[in-house]
């Protein structure tokens, strides 16, 4: 079953956007990942094969930065600390860097699965379907 998302519908409606944006911002603030210098895509689980493939496709510097952010956040968590407010991830820095790559990987996998499940039937030719007069007795 495909998960239902209302995001596109909400983004198209100025009223709903205006209504829900403060709630969204409050949720992001309460989740606290920006206080550790993380981006939203840093929170994605890596145990998934698709995510692993997407991570391998990231540019080297983006991958390095991701690992650095995660390790720094883990260290801060162990020490029960957060970053100084000046070092928190700013909203404009919190963009999706992994999701587009992951969407591409998933689309490729689904296409491959559909292609692998494809059944090719060889059409019968007219020559084989009717018997030739030479063979008729």
Swiss-Prot record:
The entry's keywords: Electron transport, Membrane, Mitochondrion, Mitochondrion inner membrane, Respiratory chain, Transport
Annotated InterPro entries: QCR7, QCR7_sf
Classification via Gene3D superfamilies: Cytochrome b-c1 complex subunit 7
GO biological process, any: mitochondrial electron transport, ubiquinol to cytochrome c
Residues making up the signal peptide according to the UniProt record: none
Keyword Transport recorded: yes
Compartments, as annotated in UniProt: Mitochondrion inner membrane
Principal location: mitochondrion
Keyword Hydrolase found: no
A GO cellular component entry from the record: respiratory chain complex III
A Pfam family hit: UCR_14kD
Topology within the bilayer: Peripheral membrane protein
Family: Belongs to the UQCRB/QCR7 family.
Subunit structure: Component of the ubiquinol-cytochrome c oxidoreductase (cytochrome b-c1 complex, complex III, CIII), a multisubunit enzyme composed of 3 respiratory subunits cytochrome b, cytochrome c1 and Rieske protein, 2 core protein subunits, and additional low-molecular weight protein subunits. The complex exists as an obligatory dimer and forms supercomplexes (SCs) in the inner mitochondrial membrane with cytochrome c oxidase (complex IV, CIV).
Function: Component of the ubiquinol-cytochrome c oxidoreductase, a multisubunit transmembrane complex that is part of the mitochondrial electron transport chain which drives oxidative phosphorylation.
UniProt protein name: Cytochrome b-c1 complex subunit 7
Gene that this polypeptide is encoded by: qcr7
């Amino acid at each position: 079953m495909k998960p239902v998302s209302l995001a596109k519908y909400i983004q198209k409606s100025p009223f709903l956007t205006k209504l829900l944006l403060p709630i969204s911002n409050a949720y992001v603030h309460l989740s606290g990942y920006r206080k550790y210098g993380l981006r939203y895509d840093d929170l994605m689980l890596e145990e998934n094969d698709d995510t692993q493939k997407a991570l391998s496709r990231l540019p080297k510097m983006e991958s390095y930065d991701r690992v650095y952010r995660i390790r720094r956040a883990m260290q801060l968590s162990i020490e029960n600390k957060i970053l100084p407010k000046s070092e928190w991830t700013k909203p404009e820095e919190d963009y999706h860097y992994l999701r587009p790559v992951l969407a591409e990987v998933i689309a490729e996998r689904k296409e491959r699965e559909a292609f692998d499940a494809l059944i090719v039937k060889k059409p019968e030719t007219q020559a084989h379907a009717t018997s030739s007069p030479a063979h008729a007795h």
